[in-house]
Amino acid sequence: MPNEFSAGAVVLRRLRGRWWLAAIRPGGKPKGTWALPKGNVARGDSPADTALREVEEETGLVGDLVRKLGDVKYFYVRKDGGRVFKVVSFFLVRYRRGRIGDIPAEHAHEVDEARWLPLEDAPRLLAYKGEREMAAKALEHEARAREAV
């Protein structure tokens, strides 16, 4: 059984007293299917580098890596019927610059829309269970960080 490795990010921005998360609507998915930016780890790249690259390609944003949040592991079935074991490493990334939705033309086919969502709503709005869990971890991390101040 083949293995597949990807990396993604929970990109956060603090604005007007609230935390916001960068989410995408992947190309060809129904409206309301919100996900986190992610992609396959290329040979020679680290998962962290992949996560930062995917953020820029799929949202138009540039961020700074804060920490690894965890891995999401699952099986899926390819169109040819083959099973694949997939591991997606997710990282917490702080927004540095860029305008959400300014997606480079060569990656526009991958994403129908990119938008800031309130972080506290992300566990409810994200379509995939593992990504909801990563958003919840990011929310917990930020709550602990604010308590420490």
Which residues are covered by each model-predicted region?
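Short aromatic/basic micro-patch
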Residues: 35, 85, 116
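Active-site segment of metal-dependent pyrophosphate-handling enzymes
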Residues: 60-99
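Short, charged/polar surface micro-motifs in flexible loops or helix N-caps
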Residues: 16-18, 29-31, 42-43, 71-74, ...
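Short, charged, intrinsically disordered terminal tails
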Residues: 143-149
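The catalytic Nudix box helix
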Residues: 36-69
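N-terminal strand-loop-strand
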Residues: 1-36
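NUDIX/MutT-family hydrolases
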Residues: 90, 101-135
